Amino acid sequence: MTRICIAGTAMTAMGKQPAASVKSLTAQAVSAALADAGIDAGRIEAAWFSNTRQPMLEGQNTIRGQIALRAAGVEGIPVSNVENACASGSTALWQAATAIRAGLFETVLVVGAEKMFFPDRPEAVAAAFMGGTDIHRIDDIHAAVSNLAAGLIPEDLRGAGTAGRSFFMDSYAALARLHMQTFGTTQAQLAAVAAKNHDHSAHNPLAQYR
């Protein structure tokens, strides 16, 4: 089997960045990744671009990767746009690796880009998240999440996606409550996970919380 190596990596700083766009964030990441790999854009033979929310929140659709990568100096090559929810980035990487193993290319680029902070468009953001569920069963899904740990969640906090929260945040909270009830997990144990993560982020100049 062909041995595949990741020659360079990069990411933008984590944060809300209201003035940035998917295109501008992509340009930052691609430029830094090429520099890390020690190659120029001319070496790239194909690219995979993963994203899920840009069509709904920025209006850029159908050719997301082509537009973003052109601004980053990458064009005139095959570009595949990948959308697969939270697995979009890993799916793009897998597809790129498969293409290399098939002997189609030697040097490729994989990009995962997302921007979900639009404070002036809360309803659009909420709708974008709900698009990651079965939209034909929204009421059933809301009820399932609300009832998952109904006896453990105060009544005024029940209801998926209420009070400006993401539907998925409510799902995770319900699952955490259910785990605590089932296995005796404590708040202190969950807090230890957060403390560990914050300890790591203190050493990462690109982390949102330092």
Where are the predicted features?
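Conserved catalytic cysteine-centered active-site region
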Residues: 2-5, 17, 54-108, 115-172, ...
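Short, well-ordered amphipathic alpha-helical segments that serve as non-catalytic structural scaffolds
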Residues: 23-38, 64-68, 175-176
